[in-house]
Amino acid sequence: MLSHMLKAKLHMAKVTQAELWYDGSCAIDADLVALAGMREFEQIDIYNVSNGERFHTYIILAEPGSGTISMNGAAARKVAVGDRVIIATYGHFTEAELLNHKPKLVYLNENNGVERTSNAIPMQVA
């Protein structure tokens, strides 16, 4: 049996563009895509921390080092420039693969620069 698990996420990315009439998808700085171990055309879930919207789309590459996070096509209606979003990818893993699986977590600053990376989320306590 396969388990559907978090593979990677870009945490608190800042939306830099929203292009309604561009081909649909989410353009992400190619350096951030590579650092997170994501891939061009991979399906992503986007969680808009600023307004609560949650939706699916896929990755297209934006200029490396640009800090670009651009929601395009229908996704542009789900965000405003400046919104903070979490961009997540998931994968299917066997029980054997899960023994060593750790997600790649990339935490971003206000300018979509890398603050830090991790492979664990601290346990939430009351």
UniProtKB/Swiss-Prot annotation:
Reactions catalysed according to its record: L-aspartate + H(+) = beta-alanine + CO2
Matching Gene3D superfamilies: 2.40.40.20
Post-translational modification: Is synthesized initially as an inactive proenzyme, which is activated by self-cleavage at a specific serine bond to produce a beta-subunit with a hydroxyl group at its C-terminus and an alpha-subunit with a pyruvoyl group at its N-terminus.
Subunit: Heterooctamer of four alpha and four beta subunits.
Pathway: Cofactor biosynthesis; (R)-pantothenate biosynthesis; beta-alanine from L-aspartate: step 1/1
Amino-acid positions noted as binding substrate in the UniProt annotation, renumbered to this chain: T57, G73, A74, A75
Source taxon at top rank: Bacteria
HAMAP family: PanD (MF_00446)
Single GO term (MF): aspartate 1-decarboxylase activity
EC number(s) stated in the UniProt entry for this protein: 4.1.1.11
Protein name: Aspartate 1-decarboxylase
Family per similarity comment: Belongs to the PanD family.
UniProt-listed Pfam families: Asp_decarbox (PF02261)
Record lineage: Bacteria, Pseudomonadati, Pseudomonadota, Gammaproteobacteria, Cellvibrionales
